[in-house]
Amino acid sequence: MSPENLSDCNNSVKDFDQHPELTIRQCVHREKPYKQEECDDSACDQHLRVHKGGMPYECKDCGKAFKYRSVLYQHRIIHTAARPYKCKECGKAFKRSRNLAQHQVTHKREKPHKCEECGRAFSALSVLTQHRITHTGEKPFKCKECGRAFKYNSTLTQHEVIHTEAKPYRCQECGKAFKRSHTLSQHQVIHKGEKPHKCDECGRAFSKHSSLTQHQVIHTGEKPYQCRECGKAFRYQSTLTRHHIVHTGAKPYKCPECDKAFNNSSTLSRHQIIHTGEKPYKCQECGRAFYCSSFLIQHMKIHFEEMPYRCRECGKPFRLSSQLIRHQRIHTGEEPYICRECGKTFKYQSNLTRHQILHTGAKPYKCPECGKAFNNSSTLTRHQIIHTGEKPYKCQECSKAFYCSSYLIQHMKIHFEEIPYRCKECGKPFKCSSQLIRHQRIHSGEKPYICKECGKAFNCTSYLTKHQRIHTGEKPYVCQECGKAFNCSSYLSKHQRIHIGDRLYKCKECGKAYYFSSQLNRHQRIHTGEKPYVCQECGKAFNCSSYLTKHQRIHIVEKPYVCKECSKAFSCSSYLTKHQRIHAGDRLYKCTECGKAYCFSSQLNRHQRIHTRERPYRCKECGKAFITSSCLKRHQETHTLQTPNSV
């Protein structure tokens, strides 16, 4: 059909629009007229689609075609500046009534559309539909030029401009050209210095709406991008993509100097500075140089950024109100993030996320050398250095080397960062006031954190949290090897070395080896006879601080640890733990020589000396050696006892 005929057809429809009283309509392309008892637009619309392939109504401005005239009328508003639909709450105007309806939900805070996967709610169905794609990973929109797939049609449309050379949108200020008008608009904000997109939560302003959207996730705590391997969730798609490399084990970025490989380019770049000693990031204000851009950014805040939010407790200033709120939890002890499994509370979302892995038992990070698995990547990285002995992170100031980048960063603060907070009692310096406040409690004896069950006080919230587990019986830290549970993560870490068999710390006197340096230090006092911990009440001395703590309860007759089985009370939690094994009948520690089993490791250690003939406790008077310290003490009394004949 020729364009002229189509034009005639359109004119015939137009004529009928102006004369609705007509009941018979005739198309110039049909031999017979068609009759309609009630003259309405739908018959004309239906008929006209025969000629135009289903899309008879074309926009004169952009050429886009539509099925219905009503949709064309709605579309034409895009080309005009008219925004007839105005919000009564905030005055914001919209081109379409449905956009106004969607916007008004934000004032009512209604979110009727809920995601079945993660439970997140949305104010608009279209936003929920877009969100669902984050769970499925579906990318239905494919570029015909390069085959790249996208989640959203709008993203594909933006991408397709890459394949054309045209950049019709040029900046009048600097001459830079852009492929899209909105990219030019975003760019022009740089010249104006405008930041029109403001966060309602903290007042921070941004030049781009996308930057504001990214920022707002900080306040909501939302993490919509979840890893299918380990369940870990992320705020941004890019962070999830980087995380996936952890599971594949791919390390495509290799250092040409030492052949060390990395799973991302930024880590390689930071590593290479170790070899060059270069500090490319220089402060324009004071000339100070840094080897890492993040250090420079942190430093620049001293010169430029306002810090309007100040803590009333310690005076520490912050750039954002959200940072101040997080900081204030140190003083208030508030822990708003609750674990649904065990009820444990946390100050920060990140701490809760790490904790929840304990309940799932997931250990997705496996060492390729020995097969040991870990529940987070940083622990695996630290573990792998045991095999290599490598200390790749070297301080450029004093040449001290570290096997972990976080230790180097912490160390670098000694050289570069100011430490303005100093203890008046002992002179120890601190980087932030909260650390100084905690430290000063050692001198003052202040213990502001009190247990509601037994009244015991602590100078630190973490100590109170550990203590409270004695009353609740909670043991959230479970050994994956033998199923033994602990109420403290450090106890689990110590226990796990039993399975690994690593006894790195050896006594030079008797050859006995230990898992920890602290254990070796305590043991060596047996040989030296040193007892630095003295009771102020009776003057009795001990070679270990925990023994002194236990002893001091004799004077105050405090027994806060009660057995739930028989109500027997103990002055020390370890005594209660040992006692409870009597009820449980657990004999976990078995002798490999004769098969005899014991409730406690100390009993097994004493027993094994029968087989090894080891006698580590030696009398300084006569040189006689004994299997246990109690035997040595009894023997030493023979030297101190004086008979009447010897006087």
From Swiss-Prot:
Domain of life (superkingdom): Eukaryota
Instruction: Name the Gene Ontology molecular function terms of this record.
Output: DNA binding; zinc ion binding
Among its keywords, does the record have DNA-binding?
A: yes
InterPro entries for the chain: Znf_C2H2-type, Znf_C2H2_sf, Znf_C2H2_type
Q: What is its main location?
A: nucleus
Q: Where in the cell is it found?
A: Nucleus
Q: Which UniProt keywords apply?
A: DNA-binding, Metal-binding, Nucleus, Repeat, Zinc, Zinc-finger
- Zinc fingers (C2H2-type): give the ranges: 57-79, 85-107, 113-135, 141-163, 169-191, 197-219, 225-247, 253-275, 281-303, 309-331, 337-359, 365-387, 393-415, 421-443, 449-471, 477-499, 505-527, 533-555, 561-583, 589-611, 617-639
Q: Which GO terms describe its cellular component?
A: nucleus
The record ties this protein, via PROSITE patterns, to: ZINC_FINGER_C2H2_1 (PS00028), ZINC_FINGER_C2H2_2 (PS50157)
Q: What is this protein called?
A: Zinc finger protein 11
